[in-house]
């Protein structure tokens, strides 16, 4: 359970991406953060400046007296900081050498190198955020679309936390009521309190079910929709990838078989991230390199959430086209009849006789009817998703798994009462549900889970 801890040492890390840029930020957090930074800083005395102020000066090696860089240094004092500890942020010029030199000086003067995610972990351990909010910090960093960011911001603001806390309080109130009955059986309130317990278990179970119904939507918004672009060679797959990405990542030529591997790219369709995979054409080949590409394409199709299957509308349906139609028959897919400007030998009616999947007729190179493709994707997966950034969504497998576990405990409460089990035994399942919900927010999460979760963060976060 999150609690305020004061015995942490002082940590330091580079918080910005390593490389050349306008500025880099080196971050400190801990009881000695200001004192350590002050050893290196020539300008104002950082130990005497007000909190939440920024100061111009130079970082100087205290041993050699060499000026390392010209900097702006922010001083942020506990408890109104991200970690609820004293923090210092050194804004230096954005270069690998100068940034690392400043970090090494901080480490040589009393700071410790931060573990991945340790700043956010301290924010959690000091009670500033819960685990769902900590996860949302990582989601904001990794957001691939505006919608991903908006959903993560809702989580960071405490949307899911508030919902979980409300459900836990309802269960806690019920448990307290039942404890009175168990401890004072002479009042003979079994029938009344058991029915109240059942009703509350049903109510909270329904709330959990409503959250679980958002899990698929939340997963897609957070992780993206794995989308395989499939078709025989030279049918327009790379042209579709280039149109959607507005980029030349995939090589487009008139020679069949030029995409010899799977190429991945993220794009935003109606605000939802699609992880596009441009696959090699699936066809018989003796070329060893192409064979590898074909096998990877089959694997990509198997793992895809959505298949965009391209057919050349200007040519008759080939044996390879038919194989691809069979290979993707059990996938969610959209059929794209491309090159319709060159003539129509494959019509919508012909494909409708084979499948009831959505069909888009287009010329990708001439960008005809491409908005229909985005609309078809939205309709297939995301109907009603437009306002989801304001919804409370379950966005990862950990949350969904724990909600499912809590719901099962509540179902056990209901069945136990129906079977007239003793209240003290039913109470165990009720407490299990309460504890499991607490794991979601971190209030009753084991240390191993907390350590594993924060290890997924980047350094400096």
From Swiss-Prot:
Where's it found, cell-wise? Cytoplasm
GO CC annotations, alphabetized? cytosol
Residues the record lists as binding Mg(2+): 238, 259
Q: Can you tell me which residues bind K(+)?
A: 234, 253, 255, 258
Q: Where does GTP bind?
A: 234-239, 253-259, 278-281
Instruction: Cite a single GO BP annotation.
Output: tRNA methylation
Cofactor, how bound (note):
Binds 1 potassium ion per subunit.
CDD domains according to UniProt: trmE, TrmE_N
Enzyme Commission designation = 3.6.-.-
Any signal peptide, and if so, which residues? none
UniProt keywords, alphabetically: Cytoplasm, GTP-binding, Hydrolase, Magnesium, Metal-binding, Nucleotide-binding, Potassium, tRNA processing
Predominantly, its location class is cytoplasm
Main enzyme class: hydrolase
In this record, what's one Pfam family?
A: TrmE_N
Q: Which terms does the record give in the GO molecular function aspect?
A: GTP binding; GTPase activity; metal ion binding
Residues that bind (6S)-5-formyl-5,6,7,8-tetrahydrofolate: 27, 89, 128, 461
Residue ranges annotated for the TrmE-type G domain, each copy included:
224-382
Q: Which family does it belong to?
A: Belongs to the TRAFAC class TrmE-Era-EngA-EngB-Septin-like GTPase superfamily. TrmE GTPase family.
UniProt name for this protein: tRNA modification GTPase MnmE
Query: What is the originating organism of this protein?
Result: Lactobacillus gasseri (strain ATCC 33323 / DSM 20243 / BCRC 14619 / CIP 102991 / JCM 1131 / KCTC 3163 / NCIMB 11718 / NCTC 13722 / AM63)
